[in-house]
């Protein structure tokens, strides 16, 4: 390969790397907030009168359906 082609490829590589970095800016360190949940205080009305396994299955199904229907679908 000629030196011009190599130089052009290196410039293109550096340009694409800089664009990739600019597309994903870092989040500030203070933007992450932790949420503390006290298990005894959590009350789920949908789980009243059923066992722990059934309650876990219902919560999992609800979370899965919520995840499916909040996705961005491009028809």
Swiss-Prot record:
Signal peptide residue numbers: 1-22
Changes after translation: Sulfation is important for activity and for the binding to a putative membrane receptor. Deletion of the sulfate groups of Tyr-67 and Tyr-69 resulted in compounds with respectively 0.6% and 4% of the activity.
Keywords: Developmental protein, Differentiation, Growth factor, Secreted, Signal, Sulfation
Signal in keyword set: yes
GO molecular function: growth factor activity
Location of this chain's protein in the cell: Secreted
In-chain residues carrying the UniProt-annotated modification Sulfotyrosine: 67, 69
Family indicated by similarity: Belongs to the phytosulfokine family.
BP-aspect Gene Ontology terms: cell differentiation; cell population proliferation
Xref: PANTHER family: PHYTOSULFOKINES 3 (PTHR33285:SF55)
Entry function: Promotes plant cell differentiation, organogenesis and somatic embryogenesis as well as cell proliferation.
Entry superkingdom: Eukaryota
One GO cellular component term: extracellular region
Propeptide residues according to the Swiss-Prot or TrEMBL record: 23-66, 72-75
Further comment found in the protein's record: The N-terminal tripeptide (YIY) is the active core.
Cross-referenced InterPro entries: Phytosulfokine
Induction: Expression is regulated by a signal transduction pathway activated by auxin and cytokinin.
Protein name: Phytosulfokines
Effect seen on changing residue 68 to V: Activity decreased 20-fold
